[in-house]
A protein has these predicted regions:
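Juxtamembrane transmembrane-helix termini in multi-pass membrane transport proteins
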Residues: 2-67, 128-145
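Hydrophobic/aromatic residues within the transmembrane alpha-helices of Major Facilitator Superfamily
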Residues: 8, 12, 16, 85, ...
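Selective transmembrane alpha-helices of multi-pass membrane proteins
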Residues: 64-95, 151-161, 169-179
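Flexible interhelical linker loops that connect adjacent transmembrane helices
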Residues: 92-108
Length: 179
């Protein structure tokens, strides 16, 4: 098995779990709002974090202690509480399946995408720590190939997720499909 395919399979196996970030990508796909940009931000962020983990794992392993982990978890908690509160506020509004009316600003989508990406502790555990630890004994060129494989999996996954939900949005926006 080549290091590219090893990175691809390993990266894909880590990203397949449906968490807050992936649900947000699906939601943006269903709404048909900034799908390309949301997927790009998620995939490029993964690429940066994957290569950061591969080449700086030893440093991060010593830097991240329980205090830093607690700070990240508290930031994530605050972000998720804000998101939940905003969803509760929308709860009393009638569900609007018309994607043309329900548009939100680019800035709002951008900030939410950045929040779901960088305030998510699983992003760091998967990209920086797991992939970094997995590849720590690889030669330099093998690390690059491994990172390219994992990053390719991320790009394919996010764009497939975003545009598949966009493609199926008419079905998913049908009130009968949710009953």
């Amino acid at each position: 098995m080549t290091f590219v395919s090893l990175g691809f399979i390993t990266g894909l196996s880590l990203i397949l779990a449906i968490g807050a970030q992936n649900i947000f990508v699906i939601e943006q796909g269903i709404k048909k709002q900034f799908v390309f940009i949301v997927c790009l931000i998620c995939a490029v962020s993964d690429l940066l974090l994957i290569f950061t983990g591969i080449f700086l794992f030893e440093y991060f392993q010593n830097f991240f202690n329980q205090t830093i982990e607690l700070i990240f978890n508290l930031l994530l908690l605050l972000f998720l509480l804000y998101f939940i509160i905003s969803k509760f506020r929308e709860k009393h509004k009638e569900i609007n399946l018309n994607t043309e009316i329900a548009k939100i600003s680019f800035k709002n989508v951008f900030l939410k995408t950045i929040g779901f990406t960088y305030l998510n502790p699983h992003v760091y555990s998967d990209t920086v720590f797991f992939l970094g630890n997995f590849s720590k004994n690889f030669e330099l060129t093998d690390k690059i190939y491994f990172g390219l494989g994992a990053s390719t999996a991320s790009f394919i996954f996010f764009y497939l997720l975003g545009y598949a939900s966009n493609y199926f949005s008419n079905f998913l926006n049908n009130k009968m499909s949710w009953k």
